[in-house]
A protein has these predicted regions:
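A short acidic, amphipathic alpha-helical/loop segment
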Residues: 60-67, 88
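C-terminal hydrophobic helical "lid"/dimerization subdomain
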Residues: 31-32, 62-65, 107-163
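Residues in the short beta-alpha loop(s) of Rossmann-like NAD(P)-binding domains
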Residues: 9-10, 81, 105, 159
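Rossmann-fold NAD(P)-binding glycine/threonine-rich loop
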Residues: 78-96, 108-113
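ADP-ribose/adenylate-binding Rossmann-like module
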Residues: 48-51, 68-84, 99-100
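Glycine- and other small-residue-rich loops at beta-strand/loop junctions that grip anionic moieties
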Residues: 6, 26, 50-53, 78-79, ...
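Adenosine-nucleotide cofactor-binding segment
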Residues: 1-63
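Short, structured coil segments at secondary-structure junctions
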Residues: 20-21, 71, 95
Length: 163
Protein backbone atom coordinates (compact mmCIF):
# COMPACT_ATOMS: atom_id res chain seq x y z
CA UNK A 1 0.00 0.00 0.00
CA UNK A 2 1.34 3.41 -0.94
CA UNK A 3 0.05 6.70 0.37
CA UNK A 4 0.87 10.00 -1.31
CA UNK A 5 -0.08 13.41 0.05
CA UNK A 6 -0.05 16.63 -1.89
CA UNK A 7 0.07 19.42 0.69
CA UNK A 8 2.24 20.24 3.68
CA UNK A 9 -0.88 20.26 5.89
CA UNK A 10 -1.12 16.55 5.23
CA UNK A 11 2.00 15.58 7.19
CA UNK A 12 -0.18 14.36 10.06
CA UNK A 13 -2.02 12.17 7.58
CA UNK A 14 1.27 10.65 6.44
CA UNK A 15 2.06 9.69 10.03
CA UNK A 16 -1.39 8.14 10.47
CA UNK A 17 -0.97 6.25 7.18
CA UNK A 18 2.25 4.72 8.55
CA UNK A 19 0.51 3.70 11.77
CA UNK A 20 -2.34 2.16 9.77
CA UNK A 21 0.07 -0.01 7.81
CA UNK A 22 1.11 1.88 4.67
CA UNK A 23 4.29 0.28 3.34
CA UNK A 24 5.49 3.60 1.94
CA UNK A 25 4.43 7.23 2.25
CA UNK A 26 5.43 10.01 -0.12
CA UNK A 27 5.51 13.66 0.92
CA UNK A 28 5.22 15.47 -2.40
CA UNK A 29 6.52 18.67 -0.84
CA UNK A 30 9.87 16.95 -0.33
CA UNK A 31 10.24 14.48 -3.20
CA UNK A 32 9.12 13.82 -6.76
CA UNK A 33 6.14 11.47 -6.38
CA UNK A 34 6.53 9.75 -9.75
CA UNK A 35 10.26 9.16 -9.27
CA UNK A 36 9.60 7.78 -5.78
CA UNK A 37 6.83 5.47 -7.03
CA UNK A 38 9.16 4.15 -9.72
CA UNK A 39 11.90 3.62 -7.11
CA UNK A 40 9.53 1.76 -4.76
CA UNK A 41 8.19 -0.47 -7.56
CA UNK A 42 11.54 -1.15 -9.20
CA UNK A 43 10.51 0.85 -12.26
CA UNK A 44 7.36 -1.21 -12.85
CA UNK A 45 4.82 1.38 -11.73
CA UNK A 46 1.50 0.56 -10.13
CA UNK A 47 -1.37 -1.67 -11.21
CA UNK A 48 -4.11 0.51 -9.71
CA UNK A 49 -4.18 4.23 -8.95
CA UNK A 50 -6.81 5.68 -6.59
CA UNK A 51 -7.45 9.42 -6.64
CA UNK A 52 -8.65 10.27 -3.14
CA UNK A 53 -7.76 13.96 -3.33
CA UNK A 54 -11.11 15.73 -3.44
CA UNK A 55 -10.75 19.21 -4.87
CA UNK A 56 -7.07 18.82 -5.80
CA UNK A 57 -7.59 19.38 -9.52
CA UNK A 58 -6.06 17.41 -12.37
CA UNK A 59 -2.51 16.86 -11.10
CA UNK A 60 -3.22 13.76 -8.95
CA UNK A 61 -5.06 12.11 -11.86
CA UNK A 62 -2.21 12.88 -14.26
CA UNK A 63 0.24 11.44 -11.71
CA UNK A 64 -1.88 8.30 -11.50
CA UNK A 65 -1.89 7.88 -15.27
CA UNK A 66 1.90 8.28 -15.41
CA UNK A 67 2.44 5.88 -12.50
CA UNK A 68 0.38 3.17 -14.26
CA UNK A 69 3.24 1.56 -16.14
CA UNK A 70 1.66 -1.85 -16.55
CA UNK A 71 -0.64 -2.13 -19.56
CA UNK A 72 -4.28 -2.62 -18.67
CA UNK A 73 -3.93 -0.85 -15.34
CA UNK A 74 -6.87 0.80 -13.60
CA UNK A 75 -7.37 4.31 -12.26
CA UNK A 76 -10.21 5.24 -9.92
CA UNK A 77 -11.20 8.91 -9.77
CA UNK A 78 -13.78 10.89 -7.83
CA UNK A 79 -14.75 12.87 -10.91
CA UNK A 80 -15.58 16.11 -9.14
CA UNK A 81 -14.19 18.35 -11.88
CA UNK A 82 -16.68 19.68 -14.41
CA UNK A 83 -13.94 19.80 -17.07
CA UNK A 84 -10.51 18.30 -17.68
CA UNK A 85 -8.72 20.34 -20.36
CA UNK A 86 -6.23 18.42 -22.49
CA UNK A 87 -7.14 15.07 -20.94
CA UNK A 88 -4.48 12.53 -22.05
CA UNK A 89 -6.87 10.18 -23.86
CA UNK A 90 -4.05 9.02 -26.16
CA UNK A 91 -1.96 7.86 -23.21
CA UNK A 92 -5.00 6.13 -21.69
CA UNK A 93 -5.57 4.29 -24.96
CA UNK A 94 -1.92 3.37 -25.55
CA UNK A 95 -1.64 1.93 -22.03
CA UNK A 96 -5.08 0.24 -22.16
CA UNK A 97 -6.01 2.01 -18.92
CA UNK A 98 -9.51 1.48 -17.56
CA UNK A 99 -10.97 4.42 -15.66
CA UNK A 100 -13.53 3.89 -12.93
CA UNK A 101 -15.51 6.68 -11.35
CA UNK A 102 -16.20 6.51 -7.63
CA UNK A 103 -18.88 8.87 -6.47
CA UNK A 104 -20.95 8.04 -3.44
CA UNK A 105 -21.26 4.55 -2.08
CA UNK A 106 -23.41 1.48 -2.32
CA UNK A 107 -25.28 -0.46 0.34
CA UNK A 108 -22.63 -3.19 0.09
CA UNK A 109 -19.84 -0.64 0.57
CA UNK A 110 -21.51 0.55 3.76
CA UNK A 111 -21.78 -3.04 5.00
CA UNK A 112 -18.08 -3.63 4.29
CA UNK A 113 -17.14 -0.39 6.04
CA UNK A 114 -19.17 -1.34 9.11
CA UNK A 115 -17.50 -4.75 9.16
CA UNK A 116 -14.09 -3.07 9.10
CA UNK A 117 -15.10 -0.75 11.93
CA UNK A 118 -16.43 -3.64 14.00
CA UNK A 119 -13.28 -5.71 13.44
CA UNK A 120 -11.17 -3.10 15.25
CA UNK A 121 -8.39 -4.13 12.88
CA UNK A 122 -7.26 -0.54 12.47
CA UNK A 123 -6.91 2.08 15.22
CA UNK A 124 -9.42 4.43 13.59
CA UNK A 125 -9.22 6.81 16.52
CA UNK A 126 -6.03 8.01 14.82
CA UNK A 127 -8.08 9.12 11.81
CA UNK A 128 -10.91 10.86 13.67
CA UNK A 129 -8.80 13.59 15.20
CA UNK A 130 -11.55 16.00 16.29
CA UNK A 131 -15.14 15.87 17.52
CA UNK A 132 -17.64 18.70 17.13
CA UNK A 133 -21.16 19.29 18.39
CA UNK A 134 -24.00 20.14 16.01
CA UNK A 135 -23.69 23.83 16.81
CA UNK A 136 -20.16 23.70 15.36
CA UNK A 137 -20.92 22.00 12.03
CA UNK A 138 -19.64 24.99 10.06
CA UNK A 139 -16.39 25.04 12.04
CA UNK A 140 -15.97 21.29 11.49
CA UNK A 141 -16.42 21.64 7.72
CA UNK A 142 -14.02 24.60 7.55
CA UNK A 143 -11.49 22.70 9.65
CA UNK A 144 -11.49 19.61 7.44
CA UNK A 145 -11.06 21.94 4.45
CA UNK A 146 -8.24 23.82 6.21
CA UNK A 147 -10.05 27.16 5.80
CA UNK A 148 -9.25 30.46 7.55
CA UNK A 149 -10.37 30.64 11.16
CA UNK A 150 -10.59 26.86 11.40
CA UNK A 151 -9.11 24.32 13.79
CA UNK A 152 -5.69 23.18 12.52
CA UNK A 153 -4.51 19.63 11.80
CA UNK A 154 -7.96 18.06 11.42
CA UNK A 155 -7.70 14.79 9.50
CA UNK A 156 -11.34 13.78 9.99
CA UNK A 157 -14.03 15.39 12.13
CA UNK A 158 -16.90 13.51 13.72
CA UNK A 159 -20.15 15.24 14.59
CA UNK A 160 -21.47 14.32 18.03
CA UNK A 161 -25.01 15.66 18.58
CA UNK A 162 -24.67 15.49 22.37
CA UNK A 163 -21.59 17.73 22.54
Amino acid sequence: MHHTERQSKDRARLEVAKKLGADHVIDVTKEDPLARIMQITGGKGVDVSLDCTAGAGTIPILLGIEALKRKAGRIVVQGEMPEFPNFPIGKMTTKYITMHSARGHSYKACELALEQLASRRFPLDLVTTHKFGLRDVDLAIRSVGNKDGAVKDVIHASLMPWL
